[in-house]
Amino acid sequence: MENGWLAWYSGQVKAPKTGRYRFWGYADNNLLVAIDRKPVFEGSRYDSHFQNELKVPRKNHPFLPCLNARAGFASGKWFKVGDAPVRIDLLFGETSMTMTSGILLIEYQGDSYEKTYWGQPKWPLFLTEFPQEKQLAELDELRIHMEEKIKGSFSVSRDSVWQVSSGS
């Protein structure tokens, strides 16, 4: 990334419940998630090195519009977690030092989610702590803006928060 930047978070997290999960989302430019050192989600823009060189399994959903992504939301492969914490690595980056955006959502297999008027499930944001009241209000404004202006949506749920484990 010539004039860009890349942020990397690595730590231990515990899922809210055992079972199978998958990530949904999109980023302009780069978004990559690994669980226990195995890539499970690549939600980068079409011209990202992550998408073109790493070959992480990904499915595009153009019928689910998302921000400025012609490919719509991307989904990763299902992964299973138990009671023990797992290592998570999140990479997010921008290549041109201009504006950036991204969204990372998490789906639990078997749960049902409220849907938008165009049929997109409102999967919860991937969170490691529940937002404070002011942050919740800002997220609600963002959700409404997304639904009315640029499509895409999400939910915020206490039941979907992944807990950061000590030692992270």
Q: Model-flagged regions — what are they?
A:
Residues 1-168:
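Acidic/polar, compositionally biased interaction segments
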